[in-house]
Amino acid sequence: MAKPLKDGHIHIEGNGSNYYNENGDPSPFDQEFHNDSLRTEFWQMVHQTLSNNRFGVVDSIGFEVDGEKLFHFTKSEDFGYFRFLRSDPTGESYTGPDLVQIRKDLNTIFEDFEELKGLIIDVRLHRGGYPEFSFEVAGRFTDKKILGRFTQSRISGGAYDEFDSLKGHYVDPDQVYATSKFLKPIVLLTNEGVGSAGEVFVMAMDQMAHVTSVGTNTAGIFSFMYEFNLPNEWWCSLSNSRTLSPDQQLYEGTGIPPDIIVQNTRKDLASQSDPVVMKALEILNEQTQ
């Protein structure tokens, strides 16, 4: 029902049924790692790759949703590794007290990374959430206010391609109350599983000169969601906006391309070596010599 529309923000729910589509056919990553068991093995392989390269055991802190804490991190003598896979930190709208705890957790992580030479940020399979939270995290990696994206909303009653004026959204490091900023070389890991607010994070990070992205294109699911009930009381959401990069490029449907393309396959499980992490380490070693 929703598949021909090729839009991951279109959902129809009712009578126990849920119709949605994540931009057409399964992505190469989804074809390779097509169930929860394989994805669990994928992350185990990532952790083994880090261990093989003298990183410590991956630790986790923060709010827990569906058995998974918000932030994952570890470090070697020279480099840090930081992962977060959602921008809805509590699974619901987060409150002021929640944000206080989130900032405390982020401060704990990045104070421990202060003396390191470089950082890997892994957002592969980031499921989305709140764009504001993505900017909250991105504000840890810049010392100046930067334009992160533009948005435009459809004009009510207007033509299909009629939108209001561009609205700029900024990453402001002065608004995140960080006790430590990381301004050294960063490699950002992406893939087709990064959607919505995860892509907002990627787009913002792409504006920073010390960041290199590695992996594959993101999902290309950016729009705000217009939610309403159909006459039969089924719930529906439609896309009613568009997001543009600071240079006014549209990535809806195509996703944001990385600087360097590296693809994960099931063969990585057999080798217990993640080529995306290995490329990130190669880049960091080159940039920090």
Cite the ranges covered by each PLM segment:
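Flexible, low-complexity junctional segments that flank or bridge functional domains
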Residues: 1-154, 166, 227-229, 235, ...
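C-terminal "post-core" interaction segments
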Residues: 81, 85-89, 114, 118, ...
